[in-house]
């Protein structure tokens, strides 16, 4: 069944706004697991704007599920990933001026660098995914780079005006088929929330959705565990309905 990766970055964002010790991302990770999260996702950015090195090191040994560490392809970040050895690393693009990740990794234009990073992480026993736009050329390049997992950037779908998401959903569907054709595990994420997650979760073959901001926001009103449970329930229900409708 489809898996939910709960991204805890914005728990850390709330903490860093006042440079306090709360809310604690460690507790967020553990309580998300209790509520049904299948993995915990966190992005250690070069500017350390939310998740800190100490968070990564504290969370890693405590998880009962999996850690999915998002990071840029830099010597520093690859060193940290190889030292921490999470079960999964998702390589992402990064710009210091962006509010959040703005697009997918440019794999086709930096094939050698991506291939080297993937090989190094694989040698450390880490499964590697590449966060890419739902573009056939990028998926083919990801396969050439040796990646066994891709995460499709759902931002264009999530940001489409009401009633106009259909073409973006078709694009994601085609990208999913291409990834599966290459024998890859295909995940997805970015901008997904309670009102738009169902059509993505219904795509048979999507293994995992990584969602954070929407869950953190809903937790303000409903509490953390309920926000996680409700997102997971929406995903599972959408997938089950899609399978029954075949």
Swiss-Prot record:
Enzyme class name: transferase
Marked site positions, Transition state stabilizer: 151
EC identifiers of the protein: 2.6.99.2
Entry binding sites for 3-amino-2-oxopropyl phosphate: 7, 18, 191, 212-213
Signal peptide feature range: none
Keywords carried by this UniProt record: Cytoplasm, Pyridoxine biosynthesis, Transferase
Reaction(s) this enzyme catalyzes, per UniProt: 3-amino-2-oxopropyl phosphate + 1-deoxy-D-xylulose 5-phosphate = pyridoxine 5'-phosphate + phosphate + 2 H2O + H(+)
Pfam family, one: PdxJ
Location of the protein in the cell: Cytoplasm
Keyword Transferase part of the UniProt annotation: yes
Ligand binding (1-deoxy-D-xylulose 5-phosphate): 9-10, 45, 50, 100
Keyword Transferase: yes
Active site: 43, 70, 190
Main subcellular localisation: cytoplasm
Family per similarity comment: Belongs to the PNP synthase family.
UniProt pathway: Cofactor biosynthesis; pyridoxine 5'-phosphate biosynthesis; pyridoxine 5'-phosphate from D-erythrose 4-phosphate: step 5/5
Function recorded in the entry: Catalyzes the complicated ring closure reaction between the two acyclic compounds 1-deoxy-D-xylulose-5-phosphate (DXP) and 3-amino-2-oxopropyl phosphate (1-amino-acetone-3-phosphate or AAP) to form pyridoxine 5'-phosphate (PNP) and inorganic phosphate.
Species this chain originates from: Bordetella petrii (strain ATCC BAA-461 / DSM 12804 / CCUG 43448)
GO CC, one annotated term: cytosol
Binding partners and assembly: Homooctamer; tetramer of dimers.
GO molecular-function term, one example from the UniProt record: pyridoxine 5'-phosphate synthase activity
GO biological process per UniProt: pyridoxine biosynthetic process
Official protein name in the record: Pyridoxine 5'-phosphate synthase
């Amino acid at each position: 069944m489809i898996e939910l990766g709960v991204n805890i970055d914005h728990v850390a964002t709330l903490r860093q706004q006042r440079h306090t010790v709360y809310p604690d991302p460690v507790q967020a990770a553990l309580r998300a697991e209790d509520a049904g999260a299948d993995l915990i996702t966190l992005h250690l950015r070069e500017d350390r704007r939310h998740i800190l090195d100490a968070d990564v090191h504290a969370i890693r040994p405590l998880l009962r599920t999996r850690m999915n560490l998002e990071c840029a392809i830099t010597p520093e970040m690859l060193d940290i990933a190889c030292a921490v050895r999470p079960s999964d690393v998702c390589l992402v693009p990064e710009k210091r001026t962006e509010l959040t990740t703005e697009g997918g990794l440019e794999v086709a234009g930096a094939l050698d660098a991506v291939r080297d990073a993937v090989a190094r992480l694989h040698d450390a026993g880490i499964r590697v995914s590449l966060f890419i736009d739902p573009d056939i050329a990028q998926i083919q390049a990801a396969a050439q780079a040796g990646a066994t997992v891709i995460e499709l950037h759902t931002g264009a779908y999530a940001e489409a005006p009401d009633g106009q998401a259909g073409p973006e959903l078709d694009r994601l569907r085609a990208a999913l088929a291409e990834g599966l054709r290459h024998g890859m595990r295909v995940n997805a994420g970015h901008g997904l929330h309670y009102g738009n997650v169902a059509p993505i979760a219904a795509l048979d073959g999507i293994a995992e959705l990584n969602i954070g901001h929407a869950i953190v926001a809903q937790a303000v009103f409903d509490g953390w565990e309920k926000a996680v449970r409700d997102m997971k329930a929406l995903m599972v229900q959408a997938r089950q309905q899609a399978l029954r409708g075949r």
